[in-house]
């Protein structure tokens, strides 16, 4: 039996972020829809060809998305929120962008769809909205059009479709509450129609993604799989596809399904391959996700060969990426500045395709030459284990010396709050922002010129100082109470810290999609982490010298730096987080010495770091909270520690949020209409809270009345004396005109509420 290989998906954005540039040009009115569509066509054709040339047997089609693949699925099913619908019920690419960005068909603002993390990754999807009695129809034929495109280009393909149960699981009920699973029978006819269309095109296999099967699903959701897949069987072969964790706990449900194959993630999952093989119907195809789609490390192909060889010829077998390569940068060959040793440890999406091809060839026709090729390929990643670039004895000693006293503040919150009130004397409903201000073309140009050597250090610092001065002046003029320096010097909240810490390396083109047109370039953690010198102190001290009002020191927390980097795989995540915490603990101490009295330690990724299964949560939360406290607890009692979290659902982790013992927490709540505050109310959260009062991901400017209404809603749940007033998130991606207007409205809303209290 010949083994084939395939990928579950490929990065969409393009090596030079061509998709991002085309999207933003179109949104700004600088290019036509046809020009945008052409960029998409060119990228798809290039990516299919590149995968095929790298040795991929079946290229995925349907993994491309103009904004997000879950949103694409919503449109496929005709699921468009009423506020975004065209008058004639038609669906086009503008419908898709309106849902993602927040505009009505008239051009007036309409709330964007809620956005949240895709399982435990750094990718965001647009949350489908469901209403009772909703109608579904095949509304958007992007998948079929792209299948036609790929077939016309002569590719051997495997269409990709998000499965019906995972799709419903990922959504939220809007309006009157009901069980969204009850919509299953309404969406299945659309899936049947799509599969019938694919069958007409001669498609043999369809990858139907059901990553919800790695979760601990309620029994009624598990029970829904059998009738759902009964309804979908017969027209094409279905490869039931799971990723991000193991499936052993749901194996009884899975093996009874009328599908022809199963894909499992054997990188993130811990399923025993022999047990899996034994438990599955013998005629099923088993696709093994052996190449990590979520990290940048070269695979040890020799080890995989040894592990997989016993399965060869025992059943139909495919090899694949563990998950979509969406989460990987595209091409390591474009990296010209990486040190040769470090570069030899990496593999990006195209190299991962080549790894699949190499391993498949060796398993199909093992001989000495092939095995030697695998050994030569695997040698650098094996040599890394003993590299001096990886190990730092001093860091290891410091980690071993941590005691329980190192992670506790000196006084409890109530006593600290009193000393902080005396020190800062802030008004009721204090206003602040989350940290960053608009990153103008001028700011980005300044950083780029400095990075590429066109600008010397002195002139760079002068330029950044001017932007900080402007940010402070703007905030003074607006009447904000606690200021920030605006982060003009920072390219990215994680990359900036990584650049100043030992143990990290950076890529030139290692872009991955975060959401919509937003791309990030995660640092890579290659070894033990330490801080050679202060990182943020110079700019924080300068900003504070410009104003009598308190200026926040701004740090990215240890868990977020870990979650938003490509981590090492040779030590635990806990070890990495605590190494970062120790480095940033020194930064907190230095900020205090420089006179900074309010220090924000952002942990937007705390929740997304949760393991997918609850059974594993407690261990993670314990070390994640300890890492934050290790970072913060060095602060004096009159230093106010803030933290910021976004895209979070808090209900199930409130104990841990409270255990962080931050003096103030700011959270993203506007898109969920203050829903998140219910968790804090039910828990009787003891410290101060800044619920985000407007959505910075949308260009819409909130009215004073809108903000006031949200704050009143917040005050029904949290005592007003413990409420802060702030946007949802940093303002880096917004323009100055809308930022000024939105913040002016926010300050005015706070002032009105203060006046009511007098």
From Swiss-Prot:
One of its GO terms (biological process) is methylation. L-homocysteine binds at residues 434-436, 487, 602. The keyword Nucleotidyltransferase does not apply. Keywords: Amino-acid biosynthesis, Metal-binding, Methionine biosynthesis, Methyltransferase, Repeat, Transferase, Zinc. This is 5-methyltetrahydropteroyltriglutamate--homocysteine methyltransferase. Belongs to the vitamin-B12 independent methionine synthase family. Its cofactor is Zn(2+). L-methionine binds at residues 434-436, 487, 602. The active site is at residue 697. It holds the Pfam family Meth_synt_2. Binds 1 zinc ion per subunit. NCBIfam families: met_syn_B12ind, PRK05222.1. Signal peptide: none annotated. Zn(2+) binds at residues 644, 646, 668, 729. SUPFAM superfamilies: UROD/MetE-like. Pathway: Amino-acid biosynthesis; L-methionine biosynthesis via de novo pathway; L-methionine from L-homocysteine (MetE route): step 1/1. Its EC number is 2.1.1.14. 5-methyltetrahydropteroyltri-L-glutamate binds at residues 17-20, 117, 518-519, 564, 608. Gene3D superfamilies: 3.20.20.210. Catalyzes the transfer of a methyl group from 5-methyltetrahydrofolate to homocysteine resulting in methionine formation. GO terms for molecular function: 5-methyltetrahydropteroyltriglutamate-homocysteine S-methyltransferase activity; zinc ion binding. Transmembrane segments: none annotated. It catalyses: 5-methyltetrahydropteroyltri-L-glutamate + L-homocysteine = tetrahydropteroyltri-L-glutamate + L-methionine.
């Amino acid at each position: 039996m010949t083994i084939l290989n395939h990928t579950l998906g490929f990065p969409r954005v393009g090596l030079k972020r061509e998709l991002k540039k085309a999207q933003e040009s179109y949104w700004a009115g600088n290019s036509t829809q046809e020009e945008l569509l052409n960029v998409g066509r060119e990228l798809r054709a290039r990516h299919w060809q590149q995968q095929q040339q790298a040795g991929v047997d079946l290229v995925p089609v349907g993994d491309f998305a103009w904004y997000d693949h879950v949103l694409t699925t919503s449109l496929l099913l005709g699921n468009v929120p009423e506020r975004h619908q065209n008058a004639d019920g038609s669906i086009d690419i503008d419908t898709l962008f309106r849902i993602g960005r927040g505009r009505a068909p008239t051009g007036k603002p309409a709330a964007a769809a809620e956005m949240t993390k895709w399982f435990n990754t750094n990718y965001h999807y647009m949350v489908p909205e469901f209403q009772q009695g909703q109608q579904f129809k095949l509304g958007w034929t992007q998948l079929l059009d792209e299948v036609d495109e790929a077939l016309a280009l002569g590719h051997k393909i495997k269409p990709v479709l998000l499965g019906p149960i995972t799709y419903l699981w990922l959504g939220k009920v809007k309006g009157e509450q009901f069980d969204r699973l009850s919509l299953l029978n309404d969406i299945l006819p659309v899936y049947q129609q799509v599969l019938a269309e694919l069958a007409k095109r001669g498609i043999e296999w369809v990858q139907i993604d059901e990553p919800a099967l790695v979760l601990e699903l309620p029994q009624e959701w598990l029970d829904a799989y059998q009738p759902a897949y009964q309804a979908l069987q017969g027209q094409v072969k279905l490869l039931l596809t799971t990723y991000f964790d193991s499936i052993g706990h749901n194996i009884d449900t899975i093996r009874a399904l009328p599908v022809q194959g199963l894909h499992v993630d054997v990188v993130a999952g811990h399923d025993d391959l022999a047990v899996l093989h034994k438990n599955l119907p013998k005629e099923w195809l088993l696709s093994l996700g052996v190449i990590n789609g979520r990290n940048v490390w070269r695979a040890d192909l020799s080890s995989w060969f040894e592990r997989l060889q016993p399965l060869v010829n025992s059943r139909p077998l495919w090899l694949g990426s563990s998950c979509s390569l969406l989460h990987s940068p595209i091409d390591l060959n474009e990296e010209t500045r990486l040190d040769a040793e470090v570069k030899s440890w990496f593999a990006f999406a195209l190299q991962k395709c080549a790894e699949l091809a190499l391993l498949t060839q060796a398993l199909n026709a093992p001989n000495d030459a092939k095995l030697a090729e695998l050994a030569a390929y695997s040698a650098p990643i094996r040599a890394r284990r003993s590299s001096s670039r990886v190990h730092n004895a001093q860091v290891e000693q410091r980690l071993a010396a941590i005691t329980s006293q190192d992670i506790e503040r000196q006084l409890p919150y109530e006593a600290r709050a009193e000393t902080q009130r005396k020190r800062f004397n802030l008004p009721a409903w204090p206003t602040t922002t989350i940290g960053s201000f608009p990153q103008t073309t001028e700011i980005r140009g300044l950083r780029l010129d400095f990075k590429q050597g066109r600008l010397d250090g002195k002139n760079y610092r002068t330029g950044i100082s001017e932007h900080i001065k402007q940010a402070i002046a703007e905030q003074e003029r607006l009447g904000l109470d606690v200021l920030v320096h605006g982060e003009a010097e920072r390219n990215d909240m994680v990359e900036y810290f990584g650049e100043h810490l030992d143990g990290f390396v950076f890529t030139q083109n290692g872009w991955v999609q975060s959401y919509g047109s937003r791309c990030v370039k995660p640092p890579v953690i290659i070894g033990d982490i330490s801080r050679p010198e202060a990182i943020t102190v110079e700019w924080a001290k300068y900003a504070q010298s410009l104003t009598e009002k308190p200026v926040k020191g701004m740090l990215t927390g240890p868990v977020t730096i870990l979650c938003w980097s490509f981590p090492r795989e040779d030590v635990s995540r806990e070890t990495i987080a605590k190494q970062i915490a120790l480095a940033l603990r020194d930064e907190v101490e230095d900020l205090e010495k420089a006179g900074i009295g309010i220090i924000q330690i952002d942990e937007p990724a705390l929740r997304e770091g949760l393991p997918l299964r609850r059974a594993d949560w407690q261990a993670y939360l314990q070390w994640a909270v300890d890492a934050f406290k290790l970072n913060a607890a060095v602060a004096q009692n009159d230093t106010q520690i803030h933290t910021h979290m976004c895209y979070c659902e808090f209900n199930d982790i409130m104990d841990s949020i409270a255990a962080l013992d931050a003096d103030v927490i700011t959270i993203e709540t506007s898109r969920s209409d203050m829903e998140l505050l219910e968790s804090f109310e039910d828990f009787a959260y003891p410290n101060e809270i800044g619920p985000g009062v407007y959505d910075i991901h949308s260009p819409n400017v909130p009215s004073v009345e809108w903000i006031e209404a949200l704050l009143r809603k917040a005050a029904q749940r949290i005592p007003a004396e413990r409420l802060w007033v702030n946007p949802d998130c940093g303002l880096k991606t917004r323009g100055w005109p809308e930022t000024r207007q939105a913040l002016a409205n926010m300050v005015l809303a706070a002032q009105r509420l203060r006046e009511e209290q007098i």
